[in-house]
Structure formats: C-alpha cells, structure tokens
Amino acid sequence: MIHAGNAITVQMLSDGIAEFRFDLQGESVNKFNRATIEDFQAAIEAVKNHPEVKGLIVTSAKSTFIVGADITEFGQNFAQGEKAIVEWALPVHDIFNSFEDLDIPKVAAINGMALGGGFEMCLVCDYRVMSDQAQVGLPEIKLGIFPGFGGTVRLSRLIGIDNAVEWIAMAAPKKPAAALKDGAVDAVVSADKLQEAAIDLVKQALAGRVDWKAKRQEKLNPVKLNPLEQMMAFNTAKGAVLAKANPAQYPAPKLMLDSLQAGASLGRDEALKVETEGFAKAAITPQAEALIGLFLNDQIIKKTSKKHEKGAHPVNQAAVLGAGIMGGGIAYQAASKGTPIIMKDIGNPQLALGMQEANGLLTKQVERKKLTPAKMGETLARIRPTLSYDEFKEVDIVIEAVTENPKIKEAVLADTEAKVRDNTIIASNTSTISITRLAKALKRPENFVGMHFFNPVHMMPLVEVIRGEQTSEEAVATTVVLAQKMGKTPIVVNDCPGFLVNRVLFPYFGAFDLLLKDGADFQQIDKVMEKFGWPMGPAYLMDVVGIDTGVHGAEVMAEGFPDRMKPDYKGSIQTMYEAKRLGQKNDVGFYKYELDKKGKKAKTVDSTAYEVIAPVVTSEKREFDAQEIIDRMMLALCNETVRCLEDNIVATPAEADMAMIMGIGFPPFRGGPCRYIDQTGVAEYVALCNKYAHLGKAYEAPQLLRDMAENNKKFYG
C-alpha cells in the first residue's frame, strides 16, 4: 500500500500502474471537504516518493465518483470576504496542479456522478474514461457561483470556449454520449469494462501509442484562438447566456464569462488566479448566499421526508376522485412514476377529459424523445378510468380532487370512506378548506390528510401535506412517501385556512388590491415585481390563477383571519369578478388574452380594465416609487410567512422558504421570505413594518420579528 488515508488509498496494481482510489470514510459519497483535500495532498506526496509508480488510474469505491465540494463546509468560507476566499482557494489550486504535474500519465475512471469539484478532479487527469451509466457536469451556477477548482480554465482548453460556456452556464449533468461528442471524455465503456479500459489507456500512454504529454500541454497553454476569434466567441457566448440570466438577479454567469475571457490568453497558472478572483466575487454576493441556502434547505427537506419512510405503509394501488385537468394530472404523475392508479368520476365525459390530460402529457414526452411509445403505453395502462367504486377495496390511498366546495367534498369523502378498507388513507387535494373541518364528515378522521398539489401538477414540484387535528402520523408519513415517489417535494404543514402557501399568497394579493385602491397602476406594479424577480406580476398572476378562484380564496382567508385579511373596502379584484372578467379562462381580466402563433394565450393591454376598476380607486392615480411598491407587496407576504412560523403551521424557515419558491415562484436568487428578511436586516425590516403599519394589521411586524430584532437574531446563522 503506497498510501492509506481516510479519503484516498493508493496501491500498486501491475506493470507500474497504481490505483488512486477515492473512498471517503464515514460518508456514502465522495466529496471534497478539508479532510479530503488534506488527504489528496498527502497521497500526491506518497506517489512522488514511490518512483516505481509509472502511471495512475483514478477510481472511486462508491457508486458515485465524486459529487463535488462540501458546500456546507466551504460555504462558511464565503462569509469571510473576498480576500479570505482567494487565500483559501489558491492553495487548493496548488494541490490540484501538483497532481496534474506528476510526470506520469493519469486516467480518470468515472464510474458514476462526477459533479463540480468531482469533475474538476477528472479534468486534472490526462484522460477520462466514462462508464455508460455515469454523468458528468459543473452545476455550480445553480448555487450562484461557478467552478472554482480550475473547471473554467481546463474545460475551455479541452472542449473550446463555446462548449465550455454551455456546459458551465446550463449547469446540467451531461450523459456519456454528449460528453464524448464534446471531447470532455475520451472513451465511454460499459461499467464492467471501466477499470480494464482505464488501465489499457495508461498502458498505451506508457508505450508511446498516445501522446499524453501533448494532451496535457493543451490544458497548460492559452486557449487556441487568436484575439479576434476569442472576441467573436465571447460576444456570441455573452449574448446567449445573458439573455437568459439577468446579471442584476444572477451575477454568476457574467462573472464566469468575464473570468473565462480574461484568462483565455493566459497560461494555466495565471488563468487560475483570474478564475479564483472571479469565483470570490461571485461567492460573496447575496445571490450566492441565497442560492446556496436553497440547496442546503433542499437537503434538510429531503432528510426530513426520509424520516417518514419508517412510519409509512406501502402504496401499491392509488386512486383519484375527480377526473378533470387536476385529476388527470395527478393520475399521470402517479402512473409515470410507477404507481398504478384508479381514476373515478361520475360521468364518461369527465373520465375522457382526465385521460385526455394524461395522454396529452405523455404524447409531449414522446415527441420530445424523453419517452418511447412503448413506455407511454405502459404508463397509460397503469391508469384505470372507472365510474364505480368496485375496485376500491384494493386501494391503499385515495386522493380526492373534486370541486373546491366543502359540501360536495364532505359528501364525496363520506361516500368514499364507506367503500374502502379501514386502513386506507384518504387525502384531499383541497387548496383552502380546513382538513379538520372536512374530517368531521368521516368516521375515521385519523386516516384523513391533506395532499395539496399545485397546478399544473406535472410542472409544479411542491405538495403540501396537511396534518388535521386528528390526522395520524401514519397517514402523514404514507402521504409524504407517496408524494416523493411521485417525484414531488412534500412539505408537512399543520391545518389552518389556506394552509401555508395560500395563507401567505393572499396577503400579497391583498397588498396589490390596496395599492390599486391608492391609485397605483397594475401594469406598473407588474413591471416592478417582475424586475424584482417574480416570474409574473400580481395582476398577471391573478389572471392566470383565475379571478373567480382568487375571490373564493380571499373569502375563505377573510373568514379565517378577519383582523388582517378582511378588507373594509371593495377592491379591484372583486370588481373584476362582478364584471365577469375572470382572467385567462374567459380571455379578459386585468389583461386581454389572444392566442399567439404557438397557440398559447398571450396578454395584451386592455383599456377597459381601467374603466372597470375606476369606481373603487379612491385616490388619484399616480406613479408610485418602485421601492414603495416592493416594500408594500413584500412586507405583507413576508409577515404572513413569519406568522405561519409563530403559529407552528410550518416547522422551519427552511421549509417555509422552499415552499414559497416552489409553490408561488418567489424569486430563487432572493432565497425565500425568511432569507429576504435576513438579507434586508431584521431590525431594518421591522422599521419598514413600522413605517407602513398605518396600512393595516398585515403590515405590523410579528412579535417573533420584534424579538429577533431586539436580540440581534437571524433566521439563518
């Protein structure tokens, strides 16, 4: 044994070839943390001290190769400032360089996921052989940073500027065929032939059949383009990347491009210094803090959800009641992830609509070559449309998705309970009606739970799992595990009107309505909030949701929270509803809708909308300062999020923030309401609440925030 460390072992195989094996002890995956980097340095020194080593294959003992840097650990460095990040990163480059510079050929044998720093490790090797089951990539842009272990420098020299920019900016893992085509790997083989192929490539290098030194030299030299070619390549890349990523919202892509361009004409060592400086600039941005926070929050939620597996009972057969767009979407989602599902309704036209929804979604998958026609057939076969309860004795969980009307739901739920086994879980897809209230119609309320999908089901990642007063932990656990199996992110919340997401969303709509009353222009509000980072402004969002749906939800919320959600005036949303302007569903709302060339509804300005709401605008119309619009909209939303934490509706800031991002499109680069309050400064945020408190209770700072401000506390750290 040449080296035996906690993260790496090095041992001779044969013919002067040694195996440099990553196997981080006590972890299920390999990752670059401080311990791994220290061991990496020690292992390199050990190889240097063993002249009998003539070549290396780099392998992993795990099912993945290396999944990247330990962001939990390294993220702590980012709070230390730009200079400290550079001082931390440059010695890491020295270690990677010393491995690259070993005067022997090295081949990475990529058996599984090689992401971020893991793929940067592969790039340090002279050759890369990849299993046909593996994936490689540089996902750091999703975290508000970019590759910082030499990825921008080495990849651009290996595969060219245009390809490297696409790999880094898109941040998506690459399958073997794509990696081979672009030249990021040198061979793709079956998993069982991987080590043999890597050893064979080292032997070819040692025998002089491949020029490994010339191959390495490409990575040490400047990019092979003259200044004019470089300028053209970067201008094209900037146009493509910055059209998708506004630097004011997502600065990392532009910082990456600037670093790449500045380092392209330099040799490796100087280019790495440029990369490090750019990386440090990205790492200290509030966007990086927010996006890294989201990644960590996602890990927390996955761990929380995993804990439910022990308490769940298996779901071998599901059912959905109500076969409209929602029911069809739920059936599609379950069936496409392998769970057989019965879809019941009271009439054939409704069943046809549900099957049409599932069929349409699957057809699109086939057209995009993401699914074969045979797999589509298998998926459709898992959906059994029916008008009867005959097969419901087989069902482990029933998801009710009928009209959002308490009396109808209560009747359907009671009827269903009589047709299923005593241990069958019944879940309601209600968006606002109290689970505790609906449970009163049932004999076994402990088996009843909320399972709130968001529309469209196939696109929206969040499922709220709602615990009523009598809901058992088994019912919660079973529903959480099913949601995960369906490819969704479940967040468990306690029961209240609107649950978590809608309870928070309606004060946001209330703030919008109040701004209109005070003379703001809804188009200006939409533009300001979209520039702030929302995918659409509140007027457009209300049209998409449906103004009738919004009015109904507002009534439920006003009944539940009259002190801050029951307006003492008639607003524009109610007025639109009374004028039968329902939004996209009937083509007129705040905007007018017409089909574009692709057959999608496109919004246009409709002057009639202003005439409709004019009677309820009590102040003279004026142009508002953008920051006032932002403050009034965001305070109402963030305050209600904090109240949900105070009331134990949601357990943690991490879950609250993720729910808002996945459920209503809160700008990811701002990290969620709790992160937004932290980055504003809790004391400063409370002062803003005080400034706008005259607008009503929705603007009053919750006691939790006042206590946090007094004690200099934050939600994170």
UniProtKB/Swiss-Prot annotation:
Residues 313-717 are annotated as: 3-hydroxyacyl-CoA dehydrogenase. Residues 1-190 are annotated as: Enoyl-CoA hydratase/isomerase. It catalyses: a (3S)-3-hydroxyacyl-CoA + NAD(+) = a 3-oxoacyl-CoA + NADH + H(+); a (3S)-3-hydroxyacyl-CoA = a (2E)-enoyl-CoA + H2O; a 4-saturated-(3S)-3-hydroxyacyl-CoA = a (3E)-enoyl-CoA + H2O; (3S)-3-hydroxybutanoyl-CoA = (3R)-3-hydroxybutanoyl-CoA. NAD(+) binds at residues 326, 345, 402-404, 409, 431, 455. Pathway: Lipid metabolism; fatty acid beta-oxidation. One of its GO terms (biological process) is fatty acid beta-oxidation. The active site is at residue 452. Substrate binds at residues 298, 502. InterPro entries: 3-OHacyl-CoA_DH_CS (IPR006180), 3-OHacyl-CoA_DH_NAD-bd (IPR006176), 3HC_DH_C (IPR006108), 6-PGluconate_DH-like_C_sf (IPR008927), ClpP/crotonase-like_dom_sf (IPR029045), Enoyl-CoA_hyd/isom_CS (IPR018376), Enoyl-CoA_hydra/iso (IPR001753), FA_oxidation_alpha_subunit (IPR050136). It comes from the Bacteria. Keywords: Fatty acid metabolism, Isomerase, Lipid degradation, Lipid metabolism, Lyase, Multifunctional enzyme, NAD, Oxidoreductase. GO terms for cellular component: fatty acid beta-oxidation multienzyme complex. Heterotetramer of two alpha chains (FadB) and two beta chains (FadA). Involved in the aerobic and anaerobic degradation of long-chain fatty acids via beta-oxidation cycle. Catalyzes the formation of 3-oxoacyl-CoA from enoyl-CoA via L-3-hydroxyacyl-CoA. It can also use D-3-hydroxyacyl-CoA and cis-3-enoyl-CoA as substrate. This is Fatty acid oxidation complex subunit alpha.
